[in-house]
From Swiss-Prot:
InterPro entries according to UniProt: LexA (IPR006200), LexA-like (IPR039418), LexA/Signal_pep-like_sf (IPR036286), LexA_DNA-bd_dom (IPR006199), LexA_repressor (IPR050077), Peptidase_S24_LexA (IPR006197), Peptidase_S24_S26A/B/C (IPR015927), WH-like_DNA-bd_sf (IPR036388)
Site (Cleavage) location in chain: 85-86
Protein name: LexA repressor
Single GO MF descriptor: serine-type endopeptidase activity
E.C. number(s) listed in UniProt: 3.4.21.88
Organism: Verrucomicrobium spinosum (strain ATCC 43997 / DSM 4136 / JCM 18804 / IFAM 1439)
Pfam families registered for this protein in UniProt: LexA_DNA_bind, Peptidase_S24
Keyword Metal-binding listed: no
CDD domains named among the record's database cross-references: S24_LexA-like
Functional note: Binds the consensus sequence 5'-TGTTC-N(4)-GAACA-3'; some genes have a tandem consensus sequence, at high concentrations their binding is cooperative. Binds to the promoters of a number of genes, including dinB, imuA, lexA, recA, recQ, splB and uvrA. Represses a number of genes involved in the response to DNA damage (SOS response). In the presence of single-stranded DNA, RecA interacts with LexA causing an autocatalytic cleavage which disrupts the DNA-binding part of LexA, leading to derepression of the SOS regulon and eventually DNA repair.
Amino acid sequence: MLTERQQELLDFLRVYQRQQGVMPSTRDIQLHFGFASQTAAMSHLKALERKGVIRRLAGKARAVVFPEVMERETVDIPIFGLIPAGFTADNPEHSDGNLTLDLRTMGLSPRSKPFALKVRGDSMTGAHIIQGDYVILEQRDPRPKDIVAALMDGETTLKRYLVDNGQPFLRAENPSYPDLIPARELMIQGVMVGLFRPYNGR
């Protein structure tokens, strides 16, 4: 999955090549985005290369090309409306349909067992996650500040995962909601890695 800045850079490369017939230099990229140095521009190009959306040719100026054929790894991942207690992504019969995603562009492996959760409520609006969105999650151990789908004391919720003095708790991205401190159990069911927002035509 590309960051907002990486997507802006990729779009700039495409437009520049279409209009100028060549790729921009690192100096062109630096000036366009206001980077402090050409080294910063190169760092962003390397990030795009690591994610497989461009290729750089060694020893050549303006040596950025788009792969003629992108290797795609498109799969259907299950959508869960309300995650049932104890669910796993190995039980697609509990799902509410599927989303078709290219895992390569998101930096995911099928082994991570990605799945989608349809958002309900307004507790995560501060993270720009609104009702009707689909959050894409993978099954792995969370790191502090990750947004997670968690089963806490028998109920499932989407919140930010935090740790204080070794004690994990969950925090909404909306000041109207209190922190959630587990009384008995806290099971992380997935860590958010992306978001899909359906277009409603408005």
